[in-house]
Curated annotation (Swiss-Prot):
Region (Disordered): 249-273
Residue ranges, compositional bias (Basic residues): 256-267
A GO molecular function held by the record: 5S rRNA binding
Organism: Caenorhabditis elegans
Family: Belongs to the universal ribosomal protein uL18 family.
Keywords: Cytoplasm, Nucleus, Ribonucleoprotein, Ribosomal protein, RNA-binding, rRNA-binding
Source organism, top-level taxon: Eukaryota
Transmembrane segments: none
Listed name of the protein: Large ribosomal subunit protein uL18
């Protein structure tokens, strides 16, 4: 079939239908969303849970949600800016922090639904691919990965979050082919390399290299790490302590009491207050008039 030229006449514009708003804005892939949210027709009132992962410039966002007609319902969430509670104050957007955020989300949600003791996940970090197996009367919590419009690049931080969730005890259907350490040519997976990546060994190695080559640049580039007491010798151990702290207590921090905001506009008076203000002004004017007389 040859190329058909689109004739933009009155009939074309009369029948033209715009795409959905979030598609026009380039925010939602509805082809993927339909397949991630629509449940099997033989399942009734059974939500299809999604593991939503978003990487921003300053944060790693991980959520568990399901869709309704009114909109998505978020049942659990974890953010990398929560990691300072567990001993990690800097480097909150790197690969190791992404894994820790996923682990935090999994342990937090399983605690909420009472499955944290049944499904403890992969407690010893080896880097090996781990899939949750059913134990006891209750099946493991299942969620499918939702990456939005991000690219599925091998070794991406998105898959670090997924690895953390899977190791935390949630069933996320996946394969090892997108993890760091998987060789596309030989089709082999290097679990040891992935483990080192999760524990930030690549950062520690670069810190050692940079300190030897250019100490001024080292102090400048890793100034926040050094201020937090982190160096190449204790970085890996710090991430291990963070994982242990998350498994010990993954509950969210208590919300601080909201402070009353400062008012920059005049408070609106009630009817009785306005009436009283008029009466006071009249009384003052009468008093001034009497004094003049």
């Amino acid at each position: 079939m040859g190329l058909v030229k689109v004739i933009k006449n009155k009939a074309y514009f009369k029948r033209y239908q715009v795409k959905l708003r979030r598609r026009r804005e380039g925010k939602t892939d509805y082809y993927a969303r339909k397949r991630l949210t629509v449940q099997d027709k033989n399942k009734y009132n059974t939500p299809k849970y999604r593991l939503i992962v978003r990487i921003t410039n300053k944060d790693v966002v991980a959520q568990l949600a399901y869709s309704k007609i009114e909109g998505d319902v978020v049942v659990a969430s974890a953010y990398s800016h929560e990691l300072p509670r567990y001993g990690l104050k800097v480097g909150l957007t790197n690969y190791a922090a992404a894994y820790a955020t996923g682990l935090l989300l999994a342990r937090r949600h399983l605690k909420t639904i009472g499955l944290d003791s049944t499904y403890k996940g992969h407690e010893e970090l080896t880097g090996e691919d781990y899939n949750v197996e059913e134990e006891g009367d209750r099946a493991p919590f299942k969620a499918v990965l939702d990456i939005g419009l991000a690219r599925t690049t091998t070794g991406s931080k998105i898959f670090a979050v997924m690895k953390g969730v899977a190791d935390g005890g949630i069933n996320v259907p996946h394969s090892e082919s997108r993890f760091f350490g998987f060789d596309q040519e030989s089709k082999e997976y290097n679990a040891e390399a992935h483990r080192d990546r999760i524990l930030g060994k690549h950062v520690a190695d670069y810190m050692t290299y940079l300190k030897e080559e250019d100490e001024d640049r080292y102090k400048r580039q890793f100034s926040k790490f050094l201020a937090a007491g982190l160096n190449a010798d204790n970085l890996v151990a710090t991430y291990q302590k963070v994982h242990s702290a998350i498994r010990a207590d993954a509950s969210p921090a208590a919300k601080k009491a909201a402070k009353p905001s400062k008012r920059h506009t005049a408070k609106r008076l009630t009817y009785d207050e306005r009436k009283q203000r008029v009466a006071d002004k009249k009384a003052l004017l009468l008093q001034l008039k009497e004094q003049q007389e």
